Swiss-Prot record:
Protein name listed in UniProt: ER exit protein
Family: Belongs to the STEEP1 family.
GO terms (BP aspect): endoplasmic reticulum to Golgi vesicle-mediated transport
A GO cellular-component term linked to this record: endoplasmic reticulum
Function, in words: May stimulate membrane curvature formation and subsequent endoplasmic reticulum exit site (ERES) establishment.
Superkingdom in the source lineage: Eukaryota
Organism: Schizosaccharomyces pombe (strain 972 / ATCC 24843)
Coiled-coil spans in chain: none
Amino acid sequence: MSNQGKDSFKAYSYFCPCGQLFLTIHVSLTRLPQRQLDKRHVVDEKLNHIAHFSTGNKYYITRSDGGYEQRIQLLCRRCTLECAYALEAAPGYIYVDPTLVNEKPVTVSVSNLKE
C-alpha cells in the first residue's frame, strides 16, 4: 500500500451495474444526506468530484403531493442507464441512486479533480 501525499487522497468511486465508472467523490455516499422523496443520496457539486457520466434528456415527474419537478438524466456513458439525476430547479446537486451504483475505495490525484 502506497503512502498518500499532498497530491492525492482517499476517495470513493461508484460504478454502474455494467461496470462503467460513474462518479468519484472524496466521501462515501452513505455519509451524505438522502432525499426523502426517493432516498437518493444528495451530492453537492461544490464537493471535489470527478463526473464520469453524460447528461441525458429533461423530463417531468409528478410527485405524490400533487406537484411536479423537472429532472435531467445523468447517464452511464457505456449503457446509458440513469444512475442519477439533477433537478432543473436546484442546480448544483446530483441525486445518486444507491441501488444502482457499486462503491470502491480508490486513491485520487488532486490534479484530476473538478474545481
